[in-house]
Amino acid sequence: MNATKFVVLLVISVLCAIVTARHVEEVSKETKLGTSLPKSTTKGIGAQLSAAGITSSSSDVYSSATGFNNPKGPDANAYENGYTSTSGQVIAKGRKARVSSASASTAKGDAKAAVTRKAAAARANGKVASASRVKGSSEKKKGKGKKGKGKKD
């Protein structure tokens, strides 16, 4: 490294040290805004209001029935399996955000098999149902008190 590069790097580091060493002064919200507002008003300034809800449900059913006549004699198999899954996620920001979510699912299966030496019969069926609901808001409730009374905007 030659002397010119060394001096340039030295000057840059001194400037960086001066910039980072400056005292940061705390400024109130009223000063930043250039107004004098009540404390209750400034608490809500810059607040993010949002409400989001996600919910899902799924159902799955598997039913199987077999009946057969083999050389060793008649045989019957019946199998059923039901699966349900529900999940939900709620995200709310802000003092007035409200979210509710609900999900439900059901799965029902039925399998039957019957065999005689001369005949075989099998039946399988399944039913599934899923439902999801999400409701949310980030607005203030309007109209406290009796209807028709209060301030008009």
UniProtKB/Swiss-Prot annotation:
Residues 122-132 have a biased composition (Low complexity). The keyword ATP-binding does not apply. Residues 141-153 have a biased composition (Basic residues). GO terms for biological process: mucilage biosynthetic process; seed coat development. Residues 63-82, 122-153 are annotated as: Disordered. Keywords: Signal. Residues 1-21 form the signal peptide. Belongs to the UPF0540 family. This is UPF0540 protein At1g62220.
